[in-house]
A protein has these predicted regions:
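Sec-dependent bacterial lipoprotein signal peptides
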Residues: 1-18
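Cyclophilin-like peptidyl-prolyl cis-trans isomerases
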Residues: 20-249
């Protein structure tokens, strides 16, 4: 009798042990099954990110390839095509003194296209009004920062032919392009800089020598504020007047 009870007891423990083992195995199996999709999803996300970064790198490379380095031989043909496809004519110069809104003239196509192109390339951002002559002009588009020199190197070295026969005079508020002073008997324009006439009613002695290619349509009070800044003996403001230039329309 005792032997029979002992046998039944042993069989019961064996069955219970096997059942527990099965349950534990099932739990472990469930955990592995539940975790697997998460790992796969994580791996997929990692792969997607990697592919996305690769695609972005390709886009940047393609963008760089789209820009040619301009020079005196290809600049005019380039802007001839560019002005056909880029019709924008209003820009905003933002400074700590406020905004200056400018209308670019359509009948000075190369100078308009040049200014729009440089704006879209972000060239003017973080340049300054580096020359201020009280009662005369404010001149901008340059700075002594490495960033500015680097941008010029990437865009190219070129000059623009004067376009002084369109009848635009140097009235107060017009924007005009200075000429390069280095070996430049034909007054070819320096494309990276510009000046705004502050003098009233105008600076007409400049007519015929420099190309007027736009006018201020809002913000002449800002021009007047900048023109009152204290300068050193090189006509450079003692405190930098930085600018950001954006397209309005």
């Amino acid at each position: 009798m005792r032997t029979t009870k002992l046998l039944i007891f042993c069989i019961g423990w064996t069955l219970l042990f096997n059942q527990c083992g099965t349950d534990q195995s099932k739990k472990r199996e469930d955990q592995v099954i539940k975790n697997t999709p998460a790992k796969i999803e994580e791996n997929n996300e990692s792969q997607k990110k990697s592919e996305s970064v690769g695609a972005e790198d390709k886009k940047v490379e393609e963008k760089k390839k789209d820009f040619i380095v301009l020079n005196d031989q290809n600049a005019i043909p380039f802007f001839f095509q560019y002005q056909k496809q880029n019709k924008e004519e209003k820009v905003r110069i933002s400074t700590r003194f406020g905004n200056i809104d400018i209308l670019l003239f359509k009948n000075t196509p190369y100078h308009r296209a040049n200014f729009i192109y440089l704006t879209k390339r972000g060239y003017f951002n973080n340049t300054t009004f580096h020359r201020v002559v009280p009662g005369f002009i404010i001149q901008g588009g340059n700075s002594d920062r490495y960033e500015t020199a680097k941008k010029r190197g990437e865009i190219g070295k070129y000059l623009l032919p004067p376009d002084t026969r369109k009848g635009h005079k140097h009235h107060r508020g017009v924007i005009s392009m200075p000429s390069s002073e280095i070996e430049n008997p034909y007054k070819l324009a320096s494309p990276y800089e510009f000046f705004i006439v502050q003098q009233s009613p105008g600076a007409y002695h400049l007519d015929g020598s420099y190309t007027v290619f736009g006018k201020v349509i809002a913000g002449m009070d800002v021009v007047d504020k900048i023109n009152k800044q204290r300068t050193d003996n090189r006509e450079t403001p003692l405190t930098n007047v930085f600018m950001e230039v954006s397209i309005l329309e």
